[in-house]
Amino acid sequence: MNNYKRNIIVTGGAGFIGSHVVRLMVNKYPDYRIINLDKLTYAGNLANLHDVEDKPNYVFVHADICDFETIQKILADYNVDGIIHLAAESHVDRSIKDPFTFARTNVMGTLSLLQAAKEYWESLPEGYEGKRFYHISTDEVYGALEITDSEGIESQFTTKASSEHHHAYGKDFFLETTNYNPHSPYSASKASSDHFVRAFHDTYGMPTIVTNCSNNYGPYQFPEKLIPLFINNIRHRRQLPVYGKGENVRDWLYVEDHARAIDLIFHQGKVADTYNIGGFNEWKNIDIVRVLIKTVDRLLGNPEGTSLDLITHVTDRKGHDMRYAIDSRKLQRELGWEPSLQFEEGIERTVRWYLDNQEWMDNVTSGAYQHYYDDMYKNR
């Protein structure tokens, strides 16, 4: 037995979003034991948590969520009463090349966790009382929205963090009630896992919650994703491979704001409910690239526009969804959450972090990463 008030597993806790959730909860809840369960694939990095690794309420467990028997043992050994499930393969390009890995991790891994939690919690005298299975998903399961105004219209959403660039590229937004229509192997695998989570509530009464978030950005993101990749490329004077014309639109959410939302929903969200988590920030990809160029050049002391010549338009991604835009007013209305940072402020923090932590970047971009990068972009 232990003296901790709660014992919570965060799967994928060494990854990008997961490490921010682990850090927040370890520091905020010293009476909780936070178990970071991670397989440590290419995107998992324990260096992301160097500042909490010696905390008494932090535990790292090296395990694969698809290993059902191991998961069963971990749940019992640590008397787990909460699971925050972030472990997933998440890069669309990788899913196009290798959909089987995405199905294994995102679908079968989620099912393994659900079944292990079901069996363990049902074996306890109190059953599901005080338990919670929180599954983090993506807005990509909803499909794509049309761009109905290429120049942007004034957004109907207003928060204290609304930026000067506060506009939308259409009047439609993803709601929690939007029908699923995934277009990539990645989003199809996440949609399937979402359905399994809801089915375990409907069938067995498991206390589950699902959230769907927009694009995250911030420190510790593996540089296969646009923002850290381009920051690093600008710094090293490498090409900036922009898919197609760069007109695709995404909503952006600062990762620490997402971690705050996860903490809030885990504790106060309604069982069996769904919450969208968005940043109220729609940007065209090409405009993001220009903001990154301007910010990195300024912080490196380069004349404005120095790196604009690095922009290289490459063959578009297969099945590239045109626009994602998320309506998270339900979360704002019911639980009082909203983003804390204007996008421009978040980008400034993010760029500064990557420039100040070049050793971290060098470590994660060595070896196999370079082969992946060449394979992805060299012949496009």
Predicted regions and their residues:
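C-terminal substrate-binding subdomain of Rossmann-fold SDR/epimerase-dehydratase oxidoreductases
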Residues: N2-I8, L24, I34, A63, ...
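N-terminal Rossmann-like NAD(P)+-binding domain of SDR-like oxidoreductases, especially those catalyzing
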Residues: M1-N216, E256, F266, N285, ...
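Conserved GTPase G-domain signal focused on the G5
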Residues: Y220
